[in-house]
């Protein structure tokens, strides 16, 4: 059963009316209601607030990494373990083909349902997950395979065990190694891009965000709690943090924005998956045609960020 957010209530009402019209066999009413639905969707989704975009990024029906992998990756084979400690189910690694092109796909997976969410640790990777991702990146480099990374995490797991096993070192190592991989790398933020947990698989030749995804150094709730000690300031924090694709594109922190279906990826995962696939193929062609892509990646990374000194 579809889940509707509070600002989607009118969409839900019209959808229910369409279903009743179908039961009655009233095709005329169905056609009128569908036109009304399209108009309502365009009206709502063209005027979303940043807080509503955050809600969409976390929508329970939003496609996760495994949904996209199942739809776009053919002849796939999953690879497990980090060769150091364990297999982290919060990060999935596959070898397969996208349009007959052999690729490596690395994704952060949140899981659906209580049992699967626990298995995936709610998409919060441990150090062994990041080391598994690095193992696969080195495999891709050895066999000259492009890499597609799907980012979707609230952040790296903050538990004591993760810290004891070197969470910060694992993330830092990925940043260092992914920056110098000698194969094309393309990363797409499909939902939440939370802090270092997202960055660990977001260093790439091309970094894109889905239209209703977010990318931030901390959750807006965490920011509000730290700066104002007031959870009700979450919407203020969102505006100050500039976490939406549009803001990050303007700041030069991401390369591209991938448009979603009119009702969002959570309403049409097939179209969303196809859009990601086409973006990957286009980006891959662009990178492969550039003999200096490694130098360009380095220059892009070195140009990130700016600061202003004040004499006051």
UniProtKB/Swiss-Prot annotation:
**Annotated source species:** Helicobacter pylori (strain G27)
- Which biological pathway? Lipid metabolism; malonyl-CoA biosynthesis; malonyl-CoA from acetyl-CoA: step 1/1
Official protein name in the record: Acetyl-coenzyme A carboxylase carboxyl transferase subunit alpha
Q: Which family does it belong to?
A: Belongs to the AccA family.
Q: Which reaction does it catalyse?
A: N(6)-carboxybiotinyl-L-lysyl-[protein] + acetyl-CoA = N(6)-biotinyl-L-lysyl-[protein] + malonyl-CoA
Keyword Transferase, does the record have it? yes
Subunit structure, as described in the record: Acetyl-CoA carboxylase is a heterohexamer composed of biotin carboxyl carrier protein (AccB), biotin carboxylase (AccC) and two subunits each of ACCase subunit alpha (AccA) and ACCase subunit beta (AccD).
Under Gene Ontology molecular function, one entry of this record is: acetyl-CoA carboxylase activity
**Does the keyword section mention ATP-binding?**
yes
Q: Please provide the record's keywords in A-Z order.
A: ATP-binding, Cytoplasm, Fatty acid biosynthesis, Fatty acid metabolism, Lipid biosynthesis, Lipid metabolism, Nucleotide-binding, Transferase
Q: What class of enzyme is it?
A: transferase
Summary of the function given for this chain in its UniProt record:
Component of the acetyl coenzyme A carboxylase (ACC) complex. First, biotin carboxylase catalyzes the carboxylation of biotin on its carrier protein (BCCP) and then the CO(2) group is transferred by the carboxyltransferase to acetyl-CoA to form malonyl-CoA.
